[in-house]
Structure formats: C-alpha cells, structure tokens
C-alpha cells in the first residue's frame, strides 16, 4: 500500500487551524504554515493528487474525507462574516424556510413528508438568553460548509482542466445527520486537546460565554440546530430515526448519467459504495489478501439506479445499530428504536417519510417479523456480544 499520497488526522476531532495529529504521507506534521486551515489543506492536497495522477492513463481513486462541519466550530473570520445575521431568525423560522425550500426544489413532497413539530416546544427564540451565541454558532457552521464547498469546486475545476471531469464519477455525501453534540459536556481528553500546540488554553464553554469560531474555543451547534439542519426529519446523529441516518447523496458523471439534475428516492447504504466502485472498475471483490480470507462485501452496486435501470433500492433489507439505537428497513416498512431498552416503533415510509405516525400497535405481526430479522442480522453483523 502506497502511503505517500495521504493527508490525514487521527481521531474524530480536529483543531482546524493546527491539527496536533496531522500526518502527511508517513510523517507527522509538527509545524503548519501561517494561515493554515484544515479544510483548505484537504482540498489543496486533493487537487495536487489529481494533477499528479492525471499524467498517466491509469484509473485513479481519490477519497476526500473532509472533517467539516464536524465540531469544533472553527472557521476563518472572513467566512463567518458572510453569515453573520443569517440565523438571527432562530430555529423555528429557519426550519420553516428550509422545509419550503425542499418542497420548491422537488426534493420532498408534502403529501408523504409533512414537517414534524419542533422537538423542543418549551424553547422560544425570542426569549432565548443565548440567541446571539446560538446564531453565531450556526454562522460558523455555515462558514465551514462554505469553505468545504469552495475546496470541492477547486477539485472539480482541476478535473476539468486536466480533461478528466467527463469520465470521473464523483460521489458526495455525509456520514450521518447533523450532530447534536455539545463538546462542553466532554471537556479535554482523548482526541480533544486542552491547549493549542503553542500553549494557549482551549475552553469548552458550558455557559456559552466564549463565542464560537476561534481556535481556542471548542463548541458545537447543539440539538436545536441539529434538528433544524435535519429538516424535515426528527433526531440527529447517533440515532436511527431518519434525522440520524438519512444523508444527501449527489452523484456526478457527465459522460454516462443521462438523468441530470433529478432527484431519486431509491434507498441505498454506504456499504453500497464499494460495490459500485467494483462494478465501475469491471472487476470482482477479492476473496483473500496476504493469505487471509476476506469477508464478502454486503454492498450492492448502485449502477442500475444511476443509469436509470432500476426503481428499487440496492438491498432487500437495511440494518442499523449504534450504541443501542437501532433500525431495520424492508421496502417501505421501517422498524426503529431510539435507544437500547426503548420500544420498537414502526413507520410506513412510503406514506410517512418523516416518521410521524407510529403504526406498531396496529401491525404487531409486522413488528415481530421485522424484529426477528433485526435480531438475526445483529448476530451476523456482530452487534452481539457487545465489542470491548
């Protein structure tokens, strides 16, 4: 394995201005240049790799794993200023605007994707004592997304300049719904440094008394904004309701995809990406490596969907489990529980995309059947016994 073309960090949390675990190739980076911003570095490295790889005729694969917009909320001030007043309207009004935008763009339909009530009915923006802080937090979050978008634009421009764009497949997606996490609950430890590399203290503001955006402040957007970002769904990252597991997925392949600019609602799973790449390369998944047997991939190719040849999902059954939160989807039926000891709920996603009408009580046989399938798959995917 060639490790020279790698720029990465270790751990899930990054100081965007000076990552302490930054590795370039096989060497730790101990000093970053003035003005360093990690999102830019990822994008610039990707552009450099394309310049390098495009010089020969061999196919190339590039995995561009942006950290943004994962907390901590870090962004250059000039980027934050673009969104300085955007979120002063508050959670509820921003939700309403986003929901209407999704309808106007044809991404959702009102007949099967009604907007649930705000999950925090006791909270009112007008009486929010932290409105200035909360508005600033979302402005930083938006700035992080904006900067990532700029870096992806540079990557696309480089593909076009090298003549590679038309025959390059680009997958763009997020690993989960927006996160409700508040880093102030954690404090320093593990991948969360208590100080910058040059010795300045990093604060985790419990009382929201340090404004987000700067290198020395580690903060997140919290559950109210996570719920808003995940419009029209409920819940957020780490939960198996749609707000936690449903992610935008954009595919760009100019020379082959004829259905341009349309929205498809075929379900697929992240495990299907490897199978799709194998299909694109016209090869087969390996059975062994260095004398070790490799488990067969459970993914299925998305090519039939992308080429307009299938109206179905990639899998017969989709399975999720994360710290006890769990779900199973079979066609349009979805069985889901909020936490390990929580009750199973049942939703008909064809008519209730936003999981507002729990029909478990009126469909006990379907619940039992899907629950049995979930338990069987939990054994296969090694949910049991719980890993150390």
Region locations from a protein language model:
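C-terminal cap/loop subdomain of S1 sulfatases and analogous C-terminal strand-loop tails that border
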Residues: 2-3, 7-8, 214-245, 256-266, ...
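Flexible glycine/proline-enriched surface loops and loop-helix/loop-strand junctions
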Residues: 25-32, 80-85, 132-138, 213-216, ...
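Loop/turn elements at helix/coil->beta-strand transitions in domains of secreted/extracellular proteins
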Residues: 55-62, 164-170, 313-315, 330-333
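Long, internal low-complexity/basic segments
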Residues: 114-120, 124-136, 273, 318, ...
